């Protein structure tokens, strides 16, 4: 289903006309690693051994992690950006629901500030809608980028603390469960 959904949305997600999203497979690992390491160079091992380790890690993930889909943005057939889409189940209101997450969004340095990251997020939103995800989560790399798109730091949380002496008396505690 993931592959069909991604192919269906590949050009029809609201992105730029000459851009397409495709599933990334191990045959594109060199381009993938180039974009990934140049987008996030801090704290990365850029030695030959380090790069070889990244390649091994990501090829293994591409082949074996069924919940992770590696996708790339192509402009005029050139690989310019990447991200991972995570499909998982989440307990929402006591029921397991299909959910999705966006992770490791990276744009090749030569294509930054050209709307590629925005197109990737638009694709992710379209994917979440198309797969009827109950929850879509972002792993933000820059909060200000997502703020411009209307995302916030989190939803409003109201917390109330009520002393137990103010609760009504209840003798039957058989339905109460202690959670640790």
Model-derived segments and spans:
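Alpha-helical/coil-rich non-catalytic "connector" segments in signaling and regulatory proteins
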Residues: 43, 98, 115-116
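Short amphipathic alpha-helix that is part of the acyltransferase structural core
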Residues: 2-81, 85-87, 101, 168-180
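Conserved acetyl-CoA-binding loop-helix of GNAT-fold acetyltransferases
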Residues: 104-107, 113-126
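Conserved active-site alpha-helix within GNAT-family acetyltransferase domains
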Residues: 130-134, 140-159
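A conserved beta-turn-beta hairpin within the catalytic core of GNAT-like acetyltransferases
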Residues: 89-102, 112
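Short glycine-biased active-site loop of nucleotidyltransferases that positions the nucleotide triphosphate
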Residues: 62-64, 93-95, 152
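Short, solvent-exposed loop/edge-beta patches enriched in aromatic
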Residues: 64-65, 74-79, 107-113, 129-133
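Active-site/acyl-donor-binding loops of N-acyltransferases
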Residues: 1-2, 87, 150-171
């Amino acid at each position: 289903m993931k592959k069909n959904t991604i192919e269906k949305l590949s050009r029809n997600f609201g992105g730029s006309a000459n851009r397409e999203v495709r599933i990334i497979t191990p045959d594109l690992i060199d381009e993938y690693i180039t974009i990934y390491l140049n987008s996030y160079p801090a704290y990365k091992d850029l030695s030959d051994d380090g790069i070889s380790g990244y390649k091994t890690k990501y090829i293994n993930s591409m082949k074996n992690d069924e919940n992770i889909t590696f996708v790339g943005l192509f402009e005029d057939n050139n690989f310019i950006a990447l991200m991972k889409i995570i499909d998982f189940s989440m307990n929402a209101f006591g029921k397991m629901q299909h959910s999705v997450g966006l992770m490791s969004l990276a744009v090749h340095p030569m294509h930054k500030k050209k709307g590629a990251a925005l197109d990737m997020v638009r694709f992710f939103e379209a994917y979440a809608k198309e797969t009827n995800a109950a929850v879509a989560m972002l792993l933000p790399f820059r909060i200000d980028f997502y703020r411009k798109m209307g995302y916030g730091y989190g939803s409003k949380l109201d917390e109330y603390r009520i002393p137990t002496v103010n609760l009504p008396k209840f003798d039957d505690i058989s339905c109460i469960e202690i959670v640790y």
